[in-house]
Design a protein with these regions (language model features):
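Acidic-enriched and Gly/Ser
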Residues: 1-5, 10-130
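Short glycine/serine/threonine-biased micro-segments
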Residues: 11, 90-92, 129, 135, ...
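P-loop NTPase nucleotide-binding/switch module
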Residues: 68-70, 77, 84, 96-146, ...
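P-loop NTPase catalytic core
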Residues: 137-460
Length: 461
């Protein structure tokens, strides 16, 4: 039964305080009626005896202390779910904003999700093809994995996210259902329009469910957007048996919104002013990826965050790295050389890659080829350091070959067009083509049988 109160005790930023509350519970949804006409929604974020602190999703502008009616709804925040959500666009709390009418469904789910029994989790296997060689070949995205992209201000992470949405698939041989849930937090209007236009023009909107929290939307809404997106993803994966890729951008906006709300509540700050529970808040989002026993679907996460001042030790990427299973790092130097996508493969890592590639998944040479490309590209750095001291002309013939390999690797393997969609076979074949620039005896990370089979014959001659 809903309980209604008249008046508020105080309004502080995105928060309101209500006293004399009875039978309320944490995370309970609240409805406000301001001046008998404007409706707003919120949720209880703190209870202290008979006092409740409530986050207001639409902001606290025009809320009167005397003439605001507050109704406790007696339930946690829920989002309406349906397979018909694919092809639709919603705001940060799951309300349609695409002029296609309301969502007709009686199914609702708690946005906090249900805890997954660890015993029922299945180990992530198989891969998701993004069509981008630096990811598919060297930091392969595995179904059920959480693999963040570490970017920086001004780097093309929005273009990369849009390209992945356009190209992502389960591979050429799979006939399983695949869809994408896209959540954007704190994005500008032009960026939101870019995503909409890109998805529409490339004909992928029908299998994308998009949640948009714009830069001028209430800060509090940013804290809900990833939870709403993941709730829909879990429904599609575990109840509709679909493989879902969740792309969340920008998790830095989420963390900054958390810091702002924490400051409004007067909490003691931790590192860089962020609350001490930033780690647990990030974990409640990232840990919702996975595969559940008995369900044919999976939830794979590809969160994107911008590192303040390109600092990978900043609390947001630092704590993210503790929770997730690797990272893909975008590099400003590569971007300055017009390499797109500017993925620095050496600090990038996919910890679950070994379990979803190779024979039966991609190709038997995949792991060894990736190891050799990593090792050879690392030697490129050594050769460049030596050339900066003694000059390129004084290098040995082998070092010059490594410099040539490095240039070709960055321009042809890492670099590719925004519309270029490579299959996993094309990515692996390109890797062998580039390794052919090096002498065969330099390929010390690959078994001889694989070299005999895949190493280009013309190079041996």
């Amino acid at each position: 039964m809903a309980i209604e109160y008249l008046g508020l005790s105080s309004v502080e930023g995105p928060l309101v305080v209500l006293e004399g509350v009875q039978d309320a519970f944490y995370d309970e949804i609240v409805e406000f009626v301001v001046d008998h006409k404007t409706k707003k929604m919120g949720r209880i974020v703190e209870l202290n005896e008979d006092k409740a602190i409530i986050q207001v999703f639409e902001g606290t502008e025009n809320m009167s202390l005397d003439n605001t009616h507050t109704r406790l709804m007696g339930r946690p925040m829920e989002v309406t779910v349906s397979p018909e959500m694919l092809g639709r666009t919603f705001n940060g709390i799951g309300q349609p904003i695409d002029d296609m009418g309301p969502l007709i469904s009686e199914d609702k789910r708690d946005v906090n999700g249900l805890p997954l029994n660890p015993v029922r989790r299945e180990y992530p296997r198989n891969y998701i093809q993004t069509g981008i060689s630096a990811i598919d070949g060297l930091t392969t995205l595995i179904r059920g994995q959480k693999l963040p992209i570490f970017s920086g201000n001004g780097l093309p992470h929005d273009q990369l996210a849009a390209q992945i949405v356009k190209q992502a698939s389960l591979g050429g041989d799979s006939d399983e259902d695949f869809a994408i849930v896209f959540g954007a937090m704190g994005v500008k209007h032009d960026v939101a329009d870019f995503f909409r236009k890109t998805f529409d023009e490339n004909g992928v909107s029908d299998h994308v469910c998009m949640f948009l929290n714009l830069a001028n939307d209430p800060v509090v809404e940013r804290l809900i957007t990833p939870k709403v997106a993941l709730t829909v993803a879990e429904y599609l994966a575990f109840e509709c048996n679909m493989h879902i890729l969740v792309i969340l951008t920008d998790m830095t906006s989420f963390a900054e919104a958390l810091r702002e709300v924490s400051s409004s509540r007067g909490e003691i700050p931790s590192r860089k002013g962020y609350p001490g529970y930033l780690y647990s808040e990030l974990a409640t989002i990232y840990e919702r990826a996975g595969i559940v026993e008995g369900a044919n679907g999976s939830v794979t996460q590809l969160p994107i965050l911008t590192m303040p001042n390109d600092d990978i030790t900043h609390p947001i990427p630092d704590l993210t790295g503790y929770i997730t299973e690797g990272q893909i790092v975008l590099d400003r130097n590569l971007y300055g050389q017009s390499v797109y996508p500017p993925i620095n493969v050496l600090p990038s890592l996919s910890r679950l890659m070994k379990d979803g590639i190779g024979e039966g998944y991609t190709r038997d040479d995949h792991q060894a080829l990736a190891n050799q490309l990593f090792a050879s590209y690392a030697k490129v750095g050594e050769a460049r350091n030596l050339a900066s001291v003694i000059g390129e002309d004084e290098l040995s013939p082998l070092d010059k070959k490594y410099l040539e390999f490095g240039r070709e690797f960055e321009q042809r393997y890492i670099g590719q067009g925004t519309t270029e969609n490579r299959t996993i076979q094309e990515t692996l074949d390109l890797g062998w083509e580039l390794l052919a620039l090096l002498p065969r005896d330099e390929l010390d990370r690959i078994d001889t049988k694989l070299i005999d089979f895949y190493y280009p014959k013309k190079n041996e001659a």
